[in-house]
Regions:
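A beta-strand edge to alpha-helix "cap/lid" segment located at domain peripheries
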Residues: 2, 48-125
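A short, structure-level motif marking secondary-structure boundaries and short turns
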Residues: 3-4, 35
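Short acidic-aromatic low-complexity motifs
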Residues: 4-25
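Short, flexible active-site loop motifs that bind/organize anionic cofactors or intermediates
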Residues: 9-12, 36, 107
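A solvent-exposed, acidic/Ser-Thr-rich amphipathic alpha-helical stretch
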Residues: 19-71
């Protein structure tokens, strides 16, 4: 698979099958960072971070608006749609930067507005 296909397959697995299934696209030494927060490492770090987020937001539905690749790097502009338990659904604009090695994501950084996230989830900053 091309790097773009790996990222697309990862996002689709997260949408359709959930966190556990999506981890098959994460490299053992992956570094994942939601840029307002410290990085985590490996599939277990990705798993723990996503599950922690989804406790607050409910499951995600990723809508990729635009995507480009340069070599092993894939950049996408997304709306991550959330439906918090007991709250109102909200879209979160996200810019994602991925590096793919073989058929696995080795680096993943997401950039988003923490204030928008807090407003959507009802969390205070």
């Amino acid at each position: 698979m091309s790097p773009q296909q790996v990222v697309n397959a990862f996002c689709q697995a997260l949408n359709d099958e959930g966190v556990e299934a999506s981890l098959r696209y994460i490299a053992d030494d992956c570094v994942y960072q939601n840029m307002p927060f410290p990085p985590v490492h490996g599939p277990q770090g990705v798993r723990d971070t996503l599950l922690g987020f989804f406790e607050i937001t409910g499951p995600v539905r990723i809508e990729t608006l635009h995507q480009a690749a340069a070599g092993d790097y894939v950049f996408n502009e997304r709306l991550d749609h959330f439906a918090p338990p007991g709250g109102r659904p909200f879209p979160l604009p996200v810019a994602g930067a991925f590096q793919v090695r073989g058929d696995k994501i080795s680096t993943w950084r997401d950039y988003f507005c923490l204030r928008q996230f807090a407003a959507g989830t009802g969390l205070s900053l």
